[in-house]
Swiss-Prot record:
One of its GO terms (cellular component) is cytoplasm. The gene is gap. This is Glyceraldehyde-3-phosphate dehydrogenase. Belongs to the glyceraldehyde-3-phosphate dehydrogenase family. It comes from Streptococcus pyogenes serotype M3 (strain ATCC BAA-595 / MGAS315). Catalyzes the oxidative phosphorylation of glyceraldehyde 3-phosphate (G3P) to 1,3-bisphosphoglycerate (BPG) using the cofactor NAD. The first reaction step involves the formation of a hemiacetal intermediate between G3P and a cysteine residue, and this hemiacetal intermediate is then oxidized to a thioester, with concomitant reduction of NAD to NADH. The reduced NADH is then exchanged with the second NAD, and the thioester is attacked by a nucleophilic inorganic phosphate to produce BPG.
Length: 336
């Protein structure tokens, strides 16, 4: 059975999700909704500065574009309630606009001619299940209509924090994400549409302190860590490729080797492990949601207790997208 997917919002995440889905048997995108002209959407799908050229053919046609010989309908509806997903057989929508990230808003896709399920590509709040694949996807039972795929940083932090907590018990922690600049920052100094004075400064020329909800949102993914972590972000002048540092106190004293062994044992398709001396450009395009860097593990003795630092890399674009598509595929498979 082929699962038919619709994408609402064909920006960075929407386009990269489309690319990923092209390589998955049994899943296909049959409709895209975006207010941008299809000629522009097709061009941005074909050419990508950070992720490279699309491996396939893209041709603009009346009403959409043809990708590898398959026609994809493109509509331009502002209100999800007006998108006729059903005509194209869409069962599940990837909500990637950023404007319908809360449950009530995302549910607008579930109208009479709409879809059956929605995956939000952003933190969704306390009233939807927040899923980081291979960390807590087993909380889904298939009856849900709207779920959240969390944020890119939460997808990096969660598997590392879970492995650490399962092995040694986290008491408290602070995380910092050193994060690539994104489209919500100015390329040159100028007024920021959200009124943020720091994001109004040139993103490719500054280290820009920013907030992140990833640490606090960890409680939605790993309930036993609720209230135990906090954190912040520093946006840096790279177009993609980010890293998360987590400093914690643990229930027991440990060594660097013990920590690294626990992380290696916890590795899977979503949580990678490396001992190579890599830099940020080396993780562009990786499909791990989080790539643990064993070379950066630190343990400091402090008056009989310890401070422990662990580090994991992520491509804030492709790592996150790969996780979203894993979640979407699983969600469709168990749907009831």
């Amino acid at each position: 059975m082929v699962v038919k997917v619709g994408i609402n919002g064909f920006g960075r995440i929407g386009r990269l999700a489309f690319r990923r889905i092209q390589n998955i048997e049994g899943v296909e995108v049959t409709r895209i909704n975006d207010l941008t002209d299809p000629n522009m959407l097709a061009h941005l799908l074909k050419y990508d500065t950070t992720q490279g050229r699309f491996d396939g053919t893209v041709e603009v046609k009346e009403g959409g574009f043809e990708v590898n010989g398959n026609f994809i309908k493109v509509s331009a509806e502002r209100d999800p309630e007006n998108i006729d997903w059903a005509t194209d057989g869409v069962e599940i929508v990837l909500e990637a606009t950023g404007f319908f990230a809360k449950k009530e808003a995302a549910e607008k896709h579930l109208h009479t001619n709409g879809a059956k399920k929605v995956v939000i590509t952003a933190p969704g709040g306390n009233d939807v299940k927040t899923v980081v694949f291979n960390t807590n996807h087993d909380i889904l039972d298939g009856t849900e209509t709207v779920i959240s795929g969390a944020s890119c940083t939460t997808n990096c932090l969660a598997p590392m924090a879970k492995a650490l907590h399962d092995a040694f018990g986290i008491q408290k922690g602070l995380m910092t994400t050193i994060h690539a600049y994104t489209g919500d920052q100015m390329i040159l100094d100028g007024p920021h549409r959200g009124g943020d004075l720091r994001r109004a400064r040139a993103g490719a020329a500054n280290i820009v302190p920013n907030s992140t909800g990833a640490a606090k949102a960890i409680g939605l993914v790993i309930p036993e860590l609720n209230g135990k972590l906090d954190g912040a972000a520093q946006r840096v002048p790279v177009p993609t490729g980010s890293v998360t540092e987590l400093v914690v106190t643990l229930d027991k004293n440990v060594s660097v080797d013990e920590i690294n062994a626990a992380m290696k044992a916890a590795s899977n398709d979503s949580f990678g492990y490396t001992e190579d001396p890599i830099v940020s450009s080396d993780i562009v395009g990786v499909s791990y949601g989080s790539l643990f860097d064993a070379t950066q593990t630190k343990v400091m003795e402090v008056d009989g207790s310890q401070l422990v630092k662990v580090v994991s890399w992520y491509d804030n674009e492709m790592s996150y997208t790969a996780q979203l598509v894993r979640t979407l595929e699983y969600f469709a498979k168990i749907a009831k």
